[in-house]
Design a protein with these regions (language model features):
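Cell-envelope/extracellular polymer assembly enzymes that use nucleotide-activated donors
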Residues: 4-7, 35, 165
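Glycine-rich, basic loop-to-helix element that forms the pyrophosphate-binding segment
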Residues: 63-80
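Conserved nucleotide-sugar donor-binding catalytic segment
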Residues: 125-203, 207
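N-proximal low-complexity "stem/linker" segments adjacent to membrane-targeting elements
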Residues: 1-28
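Conserved donor NDP-sugar-binding/catalytic core segment of glycosyltransferases
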Residues: 93, 97-126
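Short aromatic/hydrophobic "clamp" motif used to bind/position activated sugar donors
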Residues: 85
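A conserved acidic beta->alpha catalytic loop
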Residues: 32, 40-49, 89, 93
Length: 236
């Protein structure tokens, strides 16, 4: 079996220590058919020095201003030459050195392959594919066909939930989701989406309002509005 090429994309901005952790983790992957793309938003800390340390082992490096994390992720997709893309952003990492080897130990008839995630040392199980008010997996634990990411680029109007919109669009378009029963990623819990929960919920409300049918909006939005207002009351 020919191993498909995987493009690992890391986007970063002024997070030199987290970036070093992620690059070190990615380069430990035992999978052979892999390229590594770094998209830096013109950092002003020592990110450039960190990248230079690893430069011989990096496939592509871009350092220029962007319009936010999802704009940077779209840049990574445009540069990817692999059949599959996985985003492993600064601070995140693969759950084990042989993750990609396990993912592609057999041929996968899917458009999105996803698994569990490790948060604070605890495995959080992904859910079966469904259309919901939030993502049913963590995007760092998902490999997506490059063609799908080019057909449905991240909508940079959404500052926090463009990934939610993308995967919802893929699900509603009938793309094939394959759930694997092991952890793919070790997720950094200090990110923006974890520190501003009410803002993330508000953006999810926008996504559902844009993408879902009236029937689905009536099913999904009441609960989401309730959780959103409770978070606002608690100052989260």
């Amino acid at each position: 079996m020919t191993l498909p090429k995987v493009s690992v994309v890391t986007v970063c901005y002024n997070c030199d220590k987290l970036l070093q952790k992620t690059i070190t983790n990615v380069l430990r992957q035992t999978y052979k058919n892999l390229e590594y793309i770094i998209i830096d938003g013109a950092s002003t800390d020592s990110t450039a020095e960190v990248i230079e340390t690893f430069r011989p082992r990096l496939t592509t490096v871009v350092s220029e201003p962007d319009r936010g994390i999802y704009d940077a992720m779209n840049k990574g997709v445009r540069l990817a030459t692999g059949e599959w893309v996985i985003f492993m952003n600064a601070g995140d990492g693969f759950a084990a050195d042989d993750v990609l080897q396990r993912v592609f130990a057999e041929e996968r008839a899917a458009d999105v392959i996803y698994g569990d995630v490790v948060k604070r040392g605890v495995i959080r199980k992904a859910e079966a594919p469904h259309n919901g008010h939030r993502m049913f997996f963590c995007h760092q634990s998902a490999l997506t066909r490059t063609a799908c990411l080019r057909e449905y680029p991240f909508d940079i109007r959404h500052r926090m939930s463009a990934d939610f919109k993308l995967f919802k669009q893929l699900f509603l378009a009938g793309k094939r989701f394959l759930q694997l029963d092991f952890p793919i990623a070790d997720f950094d819990v200090t990110g923006v989406s974890n520190s501003l929960r009410s803002a993330g919920l508000k953006d999810n409300i926008r996504v559902i309002s844009e993408v879902d049918s009236l029937k689905e909006r009536l099913r999904l939005l009441p609960r989401l509005y309730f959780v959103y207002f409770m978070c606002r009351l608690r100052g989260r």
